[in-house]
């Protein structure tokens, strides 16, 4: 491992120490919570900063794994128009990433969804089977 890779790994570990990044891929529906800082000037001339969180939910159509510059592209339909937004995976602006549902696709990049709408743009859902815990045996009274 060279110096640059080590430096990137240290920075990534610092950036994700207080947030969990789930394992997701193209075709999955994610909900990304982004921190937005609004600046407003009050009447007396003072600048006021307000923070709020905004959720963006859509289908991941591309994921780019490149160390600290990793990113993913999320597409959603808003008021009949397709909207795409690229998020940097390790950015401090990204507050949380939640996987809403897992999709079944056979491609790594789903750019073909840009030309599709309605039923043809649907993605099958992958059902995650979670192993059930075995029931504890209850001792019978004799």
Curated annotation (Swiss-Prot):
Encoding gene per record: rplS
Classification via NCBIfam families: rplS_bact
Pfam families: Ribosomal_L19
Protein task: This protein is located at the 30S-50S ribosomal subunit interface and may play a role in the structure and function of the aminoacyl-tRNA binding site.
Protein name: Large ribosomal subunit protein bL19
An example Gene Ontology molecular-function term: structural constituent of ribosome
Organism: Rickettsia bellii (strain OSU 85-389)
Single biological process term from Gene Ontology: translation
GO terms for cellular component: cytosolic large ribosomal subunit
Parts forming coiled coils: none
UniProt entry keywords in alphabetical sequence: Ribonucleoprotein, Ribosomal protein
Superkingdom field: Bacteria
InterPro entries: Ribosomal_bL19, Ribosomal_bL19_CS, Ribosomal_bL19_sf, Translation_prot_SH3-like_sf
Keyword ATP-binding: no
Xref: SUPFAM superfamilies: Translation proteins SH3-like domain
Family affiliation: Belongs to the bacterial ribosomal protein bL19 family.
